[in-house]
Each structure stands twice: as C-alpha cells, then as structure tokens.
Regions:
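The conserved acidic donor/metal-binding loop of glycosyltransferases
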Residues: 172-176, 201
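Short aromatic/hydrophobic "clamp" motif used to bind/position activated sugar donors
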Residues: 168
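Acidic donor-binding segment of Leloir-type glycosyltransferases
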Residues: 106-148
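A recurrent flexible, glycine/aromatic-enriched loop bordering the glycosyltransferase active site
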Residues: 153, 161, 211-222
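N-proximal low-complexity "stem/linker" segments adjacent to membrane-targeting elements
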Residues: 31-106
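Short alpha-helix within the catalytic core of nucleotide-sugar-dependent glycosyltransferases
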Residues: 99-103, 128, 157, 165, ...
Length: 222
C-alpha cells in the first residue's frame, strides 16, 4: 500500500529540494497547495524532504518484483480466489491522483477484484468524466455519484455498501496499491482461508511515482 497523504515531518533537506525544482514540480506544488491548503502543503514539504535515518530507496528497489515475476504472478491460478472489493470514498480528488489510484488496481497481478468508488463531488465534471471513462473500459471499476458530500464516515459507508467481495479493503482517494499487493494477500489466504482480516506494509511515494520514502513496516501480529 502506498500513500501520497501528508503527515508531520522534521528538518527539510533544502539542497535536495532545490535540485528537484522545475516548472513542472512548481506547478504541481501550487496545485497541491490550492487543493489541500498551505498547512498541509508545508507538512508535505517536510515529509518529502526530511532526511531518513536509513535510506529506504535502495532497500525498496532491491525488493520490488521484476517484470518477469509480475508476469508469472498474472499467470498463476490459485485454488482459492476470493473476490476482493476495494472501497474508496472520493471528494474533490485531483484527477491525476484519481487516475493513478484506479490504474494501480487495473495493473494488479491478481485479477479478481472490484473497485467501489463513491463520488461525493456532484459538481466536479472532471471527476465524473474520469470515473465514467474507467468504468466503461473495465467492468470491475464501479462508481456511485452522491447528490451531496455526506462526510468522510458516511461516504465510506456508502462505498462499503457497494462491495460484493469476500474481503473488503479501504483506500483513500489519493492512495495506490503496489502491482503485486492483492496477489500477496491471496497467496497468504491459500494457507489461511479462515482469516478474518489482513494487513500490509505501506510507504509514501512522490506524485511522479518515481521515489518511495517514509516506510511503515508493520510487525507480525501478536
């Protein structure tokens, strides 16, 4: 699970930040600040450019599956192949993030999933077009337009109500899944078909999806 969502940060590596500046990243920054506000933008800046105690990028690159591995996963047939529903409450989502989130499902190496999006932005025509586009192209992408924003809790409940799967996962509207995320979940379920809940590690990724940072590696449950 990968998130672009901000959290509190420490000192900023200014040299690293200035090296990343370009007309493209500056425009991205202004769009982010306009959508989320200056406070969240500042938190995001700290989060993105604070120094890491242990460099995560090299570790991540060493463990991500190769294209050959992903292709092998796509061909694998499991004895137990449950439908997995991913519920997403969406409100005024930047369409770039919306596309990235949907496409992270479409490229999953495990194919028995459905994406249940509740759109609480009835006046956002860009979101409407993107949702209609993906839904028309892939029947696993489903969405429901609300007449008004009911708040994050009720929007989420409406997304859960759409779900038909044996297992239901929740994503924020600007989250992503690694391409092998659902495969790894279903692989574990082969040995634990009676499991009631599963959880995964997560990290954060740049808007361009080219650099991962701030991992949250969770311990075994006890």
């Amino acid at each position: 699970h990968m998130s672009k969502k901000p959290s509190a940060g420490g000192k900023i590596q200014w040299t690293k930040m200035f090296r990343k500046l370009s007309p493209y990243t500056i425009r991205k920054g202004f769009r982010y600040m306009k959508h989320y506000g200056p406070k969240e933008f500042w938190i995001r800046l700290h989060e993105r450019f604070e120094p890491e105690e242990v460099p995560y990028g090299p570790w991540y690159r060493a463990y991500i599956p190769t294209e050959e591995t992903l292709e092998t996963q796509r061909k694998q047939k499991f004895d137990y192949s449950p439908l997995i529903s991913i519920a997403v409450p969406a409100y005024q989502t930047p369409v770039e993030f919306l596309r990235q989130m949907i496409e992270s499902l479409i490229v999953q190496t495990y194919s028995n999933w459905e994406l249940c999006i509740v759109n609480a932005s009835p006046d956002n025509e860009e979101m409407q077009k993107v949702l209609a586009e993906y839904s028309a192209g892939d029947s696993r992408v489903r969405f429901c337009n609300l007449k008004e924003n009911l708040g994050i809790a009720e929007n989420t409940n409406r997304a859960f109500a759409m779900a038909k799967g044996e297992f239901v996962g929740l994503l924020d509207h600007d989250d992503l899944l690694a391409p092998n995320a659902l495969y790894e979940i279903v692989k574990i379920l082969q040995d634990h078909p009676q499991a009631d809940a599963l959880y995964t590690d997560e990290d954060k990724v740049t808007t361009e999806l080219d650099e991962h940072f701030q991992p949250h590696l969770k311990p075994d449950f006890n």
